[in-house]
């Protein structure tokens, strides 16, 4: 079982506005807080967002080796669409809008969002209609 994920970000305040907002609306609770970062916990798993002084670059590129994206379950299509609608006010942009919500295939109801720092999340509806 996954224990935790730690994301190093170039700007903590931007990350808190986008990733922090998303984690909280997905049910994660603030777990730890320090000058350079925060963590959120859901059950035994926690996610860390940190602006480390040891960063060697000032931007994230999901197409480089390393983390491409994080994927989260949401309850259903209605919840997913509400999150997509609200996400723009929190620094997120819908990817593949011309294929939304089936960019991952006709049996995969999901939204792909990218924040201003280039981090991608995939929101996957657990209960959703299949595209016909």
Residue ranges and their predicted role:
Residues 104-106, 123-130:
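Short beta->alpha transition motifs characteristic of CBS
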Residues 9-15, 71-117:
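Vicinal oxygen chelate
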Residues 120:
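Glycine-rich acetyl-CoA-binding "A-motif" of GNAT/NAT acetyltransferases
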Residues 8-51:
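Core segments of cupin and vicinal oxygen chelate
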Residues 42-75, 79-82:
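Long, continuous compositionally biased terminal/linker segments
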Residues 1-17, 70, 127-132:
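N-terminal beta-strand motif that seeds the catalytic metal site of vicinal oxygen chelate
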Residues 1, 63-66, 105:
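Short glycine-enriched loop/turn motifs at secondary-structure junctions
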């Amino acid at each position: 079982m996954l224990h935790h994920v730690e994301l190093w970000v170039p700007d903590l305040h931007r990350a808190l506005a986008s990733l922090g907002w998303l984690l909280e609306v997905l049910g994660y609770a603030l777990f730890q807080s320090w000058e350079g970062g925060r963590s959120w916990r859901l059950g035994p798993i926690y996610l860390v967002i940190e602006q480390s002084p040891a960063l060697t670059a000032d931007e994230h590129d999901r197409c480089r080796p390393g983390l491409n994206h994080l994927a989260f379950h949401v309850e259903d299509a209605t919840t997913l669409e509400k999150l997509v609608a609200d996400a723009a006010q929190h620094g997120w942009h819908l990817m593949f809008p011309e294929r939304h919500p089936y960019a991952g295939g006709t049996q995969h109801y999901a939204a792909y969002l990218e924040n201003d720092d280039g981090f991608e999340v995939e929101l996957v509806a657990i209960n959703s209609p299949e595209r016909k």
